[in-house]
């Protein structure tokens, strides 16, 4: 096989007159009156190859037998295209290759779908034939970008003196939030390893070990319910460092992300990134990961409407809740009664019992609840919401968390539906000053908002033993365009504080020792102050590539039901394998 001289997509006018050897796949073949044209594709793009019997009759005869997706080697000379033959849609569109030789390296069956961008094919079929799906230029470009992003992170961390240190994949099951993927031990029947949800504890132990600056581009595993921006296995840019403040860790993170965006998109991002407290994010946007590319902010109108004779508002306020509104400027004409009813159904998915609304027409409030607003109250409401003719006012009244969840989700929906979002913009945001705990309705108790190793604010440490709901954390999340792309914090580094933390979470001293005894022991041997962050590589690439599903950024992903259609994983294993592990499967009876 002759050595390749160029990639197809690299050829341009500078190569005119040069002899080239190309390897690739036949994208398309056209027979035009004795001439055959082949679009040859490789990872860098497509170039047109011309087979002319006056130049090589033998090559023409072989080209006549090739079909789409055959793998071939072509030797020829680069020529300029005629002015009328230039293809502006191709990067190589000003040149073509006049073929001298062609060798068929392998044939191909007819693919189950066209290997081209924009093809209309189900996700299931794409994943079943993922190796074909990945041939499409748009998919190829995503993984080029992923490589660029990964390389940039690695180069930056190397330059900052971070050590790349691997932590084990077979580790101990510890409660970190989601369910673990468990791996049975053959040597110790009845015992299990867990695949790590993150290297959290182990990277902290590396700080105890004195490495000072650690990073790892690491796979993590969580057995959780899936959605578009989650997968059961995913990749983190994980880092930890000693003796730095959270502001210094944030500055390192910003430097990395600015470099990544510049390398991947050639866009310059200003720093420092804007900062917002958790409370402000929830109050203004109804989300702890707000998309700040557009307005539609939530506004508390409880004081304005508390005396209005509308029972829905009154009862919410009397029961300790609140009334908030979104003013969708100039949007009243966009929404019919039917459309607004549909928005009511939408917010019900987030716990809201309904969605009240008003339109402003000829300086007056119009809508089902307008009758509850006498002239003075109507004026107060319009002033509070800066409402003008043509505006649509949308209200939720309930407990604060339900109002935030429902109006926060509605805000995001309206931002898209009303085309308020600049899809080219990249809006980074730090969300800081988190509560250390959040209340879990299902469990009926407080749980860690991030993880059990997050350092409380120093002034709040005594509250761990008395009123843990009021404890604030030295935690910080990084948000991009409404997606959380990373979470970090300073960590607990003193044993007595970690013990208080476990007690606040409901651990007995015995259960804490059983689960985390090795960490507690390490904290007695001079663990330094430390902190870090984990950034979601898949999610960052998804956003930079303009996709809306993590599957597009992972070479061999799972479906929304955690199945791999390519390999048919998960699958059953043999009785012999189970016996070796001292395991039996229990099958549910079906009617």
UniProtKB/Swiss-Prot annotation:
Binding sites annotated in the UniProt record for ATP: 222-224, 231, 484, 536-539
Gene Ontology annotations of biological process type: aspartyl-tRNA aminoacylation
Catalytic activity: tRNA(Asp) + L-aspartate + ATP = L-aspartyl-tRNA(Asp) + AMP + diphosphate
Entry-linked CDD domains: AspRS_core, EcAspRS_like_N
GO molecular function terms listed in the Swiss-Prot or TrEMBL record: aspartate-tRNA ligase activity; ATP binding; catalytic activity, acting on a protein; nucleic acid binding; transferase activity
Region (Aspartate) residue spans: 200-203
Keyword Iron-sulfur: no
Function: Catalyzes the attachment of L-aspartate to tRNA(Asp) in a two-step reaction: L-aspartate is first activated by ATP to form Asp-AMP and then transferred to the acceptor end of tRNA(Asp).
Protein name: Aspartate--tRNA ligase
Gene that this polypeptide is encoded by: aspS
């Amino acid at each position: 096989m002759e050595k390749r001289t160029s990639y197809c997509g690299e050829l341009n006018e500078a190569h005119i007159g040069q002899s080239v050897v190309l390897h690739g796949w036949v994208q398309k073949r056209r027979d035009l009156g004795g001439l055959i044209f082949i679009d040859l594709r490789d990872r860098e793009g497509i170039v047109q190859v011309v087979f002319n019997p006056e130049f090589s009759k033998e090559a023409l005869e072989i080209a006549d037998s090739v079909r789409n997706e055959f793998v071939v080697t072509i030797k020829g000379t680069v020529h300029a295209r005629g002015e009328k033959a230039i293809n502006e849609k191709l990067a190589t569109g000003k040149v073509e290759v006049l073929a001298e030789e062609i060798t068929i390296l392998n044939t191909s069956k007819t693919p189950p779908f066209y290997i081209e961008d924009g093809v209309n094919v189900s996700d299931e079929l794409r994943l079943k034939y993922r190796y074909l799906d990945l041939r499409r230029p748009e998919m190829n470009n995503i993984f080029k970008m992923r490589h660029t992003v990964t390389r940039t992170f690695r180069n930056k961390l190397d330059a900052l003196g971070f050590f790349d240190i691997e932590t084990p994949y077979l580790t101990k099951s510890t409660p970190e939030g989601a369910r673990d993927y468990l791996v049975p031990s053959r040597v110790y029947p009845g015992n299990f390893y867990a695949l790590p949800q993150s290297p959290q504890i182990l990277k902290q132990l590396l700080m105890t070990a004195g490495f000072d600056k650690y990073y790892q581009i690491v796979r993590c595993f969580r057995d959780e319910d899936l959605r578009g921006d989650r997968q059961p296995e995913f990749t983190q840019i994980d880092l930890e460092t000693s003796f730095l403040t959270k502001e210094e860790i944030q500055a390192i993170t910003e430097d990395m992300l600015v470099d990544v965006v510049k390398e991947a998109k050639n866009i310059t991002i200003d720093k420092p990134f804007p900062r917002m407290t958790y409370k402000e994010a929830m109050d203004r946007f109804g989300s702890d990961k707000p998309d700040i590319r557009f307005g539609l902010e939530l506004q508390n109108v409880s004081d304005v409407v508390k005396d209005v004779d509308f029972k829905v508002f009154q009862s919410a306020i009397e029961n300790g809740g609140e009334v908030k509104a979104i003013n969708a400027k100039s949007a009243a004409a966009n929404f019919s009664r039917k459309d607004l009813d549909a928005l009511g159904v939408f917010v019900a998915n987030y716990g809201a019992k309904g969605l009240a609304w008003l339109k402003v027409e000829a300086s007056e409030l119009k809508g089902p609840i307008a009758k509850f607003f006498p002239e003075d109250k109507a004026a107060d409401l319009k002033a509070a919401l800066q409402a003008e003719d043509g505006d649509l006012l949308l209200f939720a009244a309930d407990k604060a968390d339900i109002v935030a969840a429902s109006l926060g989700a509605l805000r995001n929906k309206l931002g898209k539906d009303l085309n308020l979002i600049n899809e080219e913009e990249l809006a980074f945001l730090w969300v800081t000053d988190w509560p250390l705990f959040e209340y879990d309705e299902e469990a009926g108790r407080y749980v860690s908002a991030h993880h059990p190793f997050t350092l409380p604010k120093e002034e709040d440490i005594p509250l761990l033993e008395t009123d843990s709901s009021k404890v604030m954390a030295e935690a910080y999340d990084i948000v991009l365009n409404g997606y959380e792309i990373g979470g970090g914090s300073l960590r607990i580094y003193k044993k007595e504080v970690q013990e208080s933390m476990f007690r606040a979470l409901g651990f007995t001293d015995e259960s804490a020792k059983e689960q985390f005894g090795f960490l507690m022991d390490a904290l007695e041997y001079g663990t330094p102050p430390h902190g870090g962050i984990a950034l979601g590589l898949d999610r960052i690439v998804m956003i930079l590539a303009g996709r809306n599903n993590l599957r597009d950024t992972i070479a061999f992903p799972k479906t929304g039901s955690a199945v791999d259609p390519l390999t048919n994983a998960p699958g059953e294993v043999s009785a012999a394998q189970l016996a070796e592990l001292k395991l039996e499967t229990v099958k549910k009876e079906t009617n």
